[in-house]
């Protein structure tokens, strides 16, 4: 009897092991088993910066300069430098923009954008060291977002963007390409006015506050805090200056 009992137990144990081997595991049998998460998609890269010219360009046109300048005393220097540096002069009439953190908007409407000094610093040097130099150059841009960036650069992240309707100006990117100038700031898409811009060419100014910057694309979002219209805006009126004979 004992021998028969042992034999029966061996048969039962063998059957149990076979059943366990054939049974599915809990993980494979459960319909709610976790599925490995896919690898995260690579972050979107910021778009390449545009360093092309703003638009059509050509030879320097002194009449444009005489209409816009706030400092006619540097006319001879401007004319000579236009030749020696082979300025590529802006020939379109598209809107220009300038970012400014100063709060004296009404004064700027009246006085215009006057340069910090009279020195015609070489353009190749000016476009590397920036607008804080004591020079006759005054910067604008053909891209509104660039002006917004400069206007909100300070700690307050708030500033004014001026809308400008003025003829001429040096297309910095076109001139840099022709002369092989190098600068990390060609994304500024700058139109430079040697001698400044009269206030009558400023159409309006709007105040912007930087609210956020996308961490991946670096694109900024701004809040418009309001605009001021320049009652002296008269871009079609002649400057009333007698242009001296060319020498």
Predicted feature descriptions by range:
Residues 1-36, 40:
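Secretory targeting and sorting signals
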